[in-house]
Amino acid sequence: MIPGNRMLMVVLLCQVLLGGASHASLIPETGKKKVAEIQGHAGGRRSGQSHELLRDFEATLLQMFGLRRRPQPSKSAVIPDYMRDLYRLQSGEEEEEEQIQGIGLEYPERPASRANTVRSFHHEEHLENIPGTSENSAFRFLFNLSSIPENEVISSAELRLFREQVDQGPDWDQGFHRINIYEVMKPPAEVVPGHLITRLLDTRLVHHNVTRWETFDVSPAVLRWTREKQPNYGLAIEVTHLHQTRTHQGQHVRISRSLPQGSGDWAQLRPLLVTFGHDGRGHALTRRRRAKRSPKHHPQRARKKNKNCRRHSLYVDFSDVGWNDWIVAPPGYQAFYCHGDCPFPLADHLNSTNHAIVQTLVNSVNSSIPKACCVPTELSAISMLYLDEYDKVVLKNYQEMVVEGCGCR
């Protein structure tokens, strides 16, 4: 497919997509009703031809988004605040970036520099006390990473744990505790209680009197599970207190739903595994900076006499095609498109190639040779935050989605 024309299929959907329930896996009924109305005014197409076009568009769009089937998010799906904040930081919108910096979140420059996809995973609520350890001091977490595509190469992974300030004891502000993260090398059933076989991945000595998220590098374990296809027995988290006055072991580190502080915020404060990967298509998640968010519509200045090749406004609203149930952000974006004449002689501002100049020259004396065409000459990427077909939250960079410049080619 010609680069730059992929996203134009979204617009073409409103002209060609029509089919029965058997072909509705990607485009829901709301979008198809709009298409049917448009086709009714345009004369429509034969049913068989429309079904075939629908299948072709569906397969192409699924491949473009890296999905096996259309996501059908459940009502219980949770979008971690971290992923929303990461999207805002990556999008580079100044007003939102200032708000995020106010809560102390920093953009992960190093992991993101080698990735075009960020995925988040919650453990499967299969929380187990590790045999032989102190009560509530060590836990094992199982993260199901089977939804990561085979062609996606993981470069790094991190485990995020939320910890709350400890205010128990007369000298609580002098205390420290250590958080150790291990990879479980063998399942608990195969080892003697109290002697779980693990390897240390990361450790941190933290002060009691701070409330914040802690990030731990678990890349070695995740790379073993994804690249080397080794069995995934999960991660073990151990909290060791170094202060003489005993506190409620582990209860200030949010690794359990049954904390006395309440479970209403558990969905946002539970442990989060984040992977950074690249599927081999396009560039990494480079951080963009923009002064202001682009408005939904950009009316062009009146150019009654100028019909030459130029960029025109084209806003793609994901709700129009029924994708707003699984695309979290953005709600839509300004894609733009190129349209206009490429008259002889070609002016410098039409951004023409030498071949286009020669072709236009020949066309001026031989009309059987077509004129040069007005096409995109520069395209840029957008970031999308969405729920995949497994209800996992994904932040992905998609190339060639926005027309930045047009020219005669």
From Swiss-Prot:
Keywords: Chondrogenesis, Cleavage on pair of basic residues, Cytokine, Developmental protein, Differentiation, Disulfide bond, Extracellular matrix, Glycoprotein, Growth factor, Osteogenesis, Phosphoprotein, Secreted, Signal. Residues 1-24 form the signal peptide. One of its GO terms (biological process) is negative regulation of glomerular mesangial cell proliferation. The modification Phosphoserine is found at S91. Residues 284-308 are annotated as: Disordered. Belongs to the TGF-beta family. This is Bone morphogenetic protein 4. It comes from Bos taurus.
